[in-house]
Amino acid sequence: MPNKNMTNKLKYILYQFLTGTVGNFLVFLQPKKARRLAENRITLVHKNKKNLSVSERLMRAALVKKLDKIDDYNQIAELNRGFWINNATELFVETEDGFETDFLPNCTFIFDLLKDELGDQRAAFSTLVEIGTGNGDVLNYLSSEFPEVNRFVGIDLSPKQIELNKSKFNDNKKLEFVAADAFDWVTEHGHSNTIFVTSRGVLEYFLEERLQDFFKEIYRLGKSVFIAIEPNGGGHNFETSPHSQLYGNEPSFSHNYPRLFKNAGFTIWHFSQKPWLGGYDKQTFVGAKSF
């Protein structure tokens, strides 16, 4: 029997074939709908397929394949940053079911491992910071999983989303939401005895050099733990290609997270990967600590 990775790869190849034939034909037949689907590059890439019909899914995939290739890393970083500041709220609405369909069944195990890793030191960590908090659901969940932590800070580039989160979670007094650049916030407000978290696609928008500097800045704070749940390109082999690569259609960056954490001084206590949302790319789980 073929293994799971081979099955996923075959599904991926079949899907690419269908989008290249049926999808392109539908785009030709329905140009107005195609223009509506393609209004924003990143929204097009991430659009929640559950809200689309089968024909719209094939059209979307065909349009994604037609996107102009971008090779300038600085341009990519700026385009993505601009999107997350100005247009992220609409995308969070599109993908809000991800907390129930992806995070809860596929990602919560690493926080159980974190509890075991911290052991009797759990009480020493007074603050948990989620970088790229999005709609705040993950931060709210973590506040119930780590009752000994007094302060939960959610940082996001989108001022509009932060205001929505403040209203949505007004009853949870442990939560704070801040519209800021994560690097700037950590430099000004970061301190020791902090757990840092990213969930399902945040660090992928950092340039490699900036991400390395960010990890070093956190390491300098003192005692800290970092949980990174981040996507990687399906073909990114960290041993043969140790540096960051472009992946996906936004595109964003597939980083060698273990290498970057180690270079900053952290110890890796957990590393694992699994297929991301049943596709060819991988979801990577890293637990790192500075002590």
Where are these regions (language model features)?
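Class I (Rossmann-like) S-adenosyl-L-methionine-dependent methyltransferase catalytic domain
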Residues: 2-189, 209-213, 217, 225-291
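Hydrophobic adenine-recognition pocket in adenosine-nucleotide-binding enzymes
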Residues: 202
